[in-house]
Amino acid sequence: MDNRIPYDDYPVVFLPAYENPPAWIPPHERVYHPDYNNELTQFLPRIVTLKKPPGAQLGFNIRGGKASQLGIFISKVIPDSDAHRAGLQEGDQVLAVNDVDFQDIEHSKAVEILKTAREISMRVRFFPYNYHRQKERTVH
């Protein structure tokens, strides 16, 4: 199954203005300098796999859905849970679960899929900007 989404189907998101690195940090030192970090790999999509025994909790909460037009986001991760150990964090956008697209899904349908699955393969990305916009809309 091809999980790529046509470019025209992506929502338009206006990001804050990019801030240039300080001029006093030489370009060859910017990657590892403690006052400037241009490492963006934390924002790339990643796969998180969880196994849930019958009757067990997933270890995280979600918010959002189709009504918010911003997607489904991880809103809470229980410390020391399997979800926490797998690397899920507040602000992760859930892109897909078990090959089901979560970018335009009703909240109730997303909850149903997550609660009924025993093995979960989630494609997520850390997207704090839209997560904070999501919280401002007070939908789920």
From Swiss-Prot:
Its main location: cytoplasm. Transmembrane segments: none annotated. Residues 47-129 form the PDZ domain. One of its GO terms (biological process) is pore complex assembly. Signal peptide: none annotated. Pfam families: PDZ. It is found in: Cytoplasm; Cell junction, Adherens junction; Cell membrane. Keywords: Cell junction, Cell membrane, Cytoplasm, Membrane. GO terms for cellular component: adherens junction; basolateral plasma membrane; cytosol; plasma membrane; pore complex. GO terms for molecular function: enzyme activator activity; transporter activator activity. PROSITE patterns: PDZ. The keyword Glycoprotein does not apply. The keyword Oxidoreductase does not apply. CDD domains: PDZ_PDZD11-like (cd06752). PANTHER family: PROTEIN LIN-7 HOMOLOG. Mediates docking of ADAM10 to zonula adherens by interacting with PLEKHA7 which is required for PLEKHA7 to interact with the ADAM10-binding protein TSPAN33. Interacts with ATP2B1, ATP2B2, ATP2B3, ATP2B4 and ATP7A. Interacts with PLEKHA7 (via WW domains) at zonula adherens; this interaction is essential for the interaction between PLEKHA7 and the ADAM10-binding protein TSPAN33. Interacts with SLC5A6. This is PDZ domain-containing protein 11. The gene is Pdzd11.
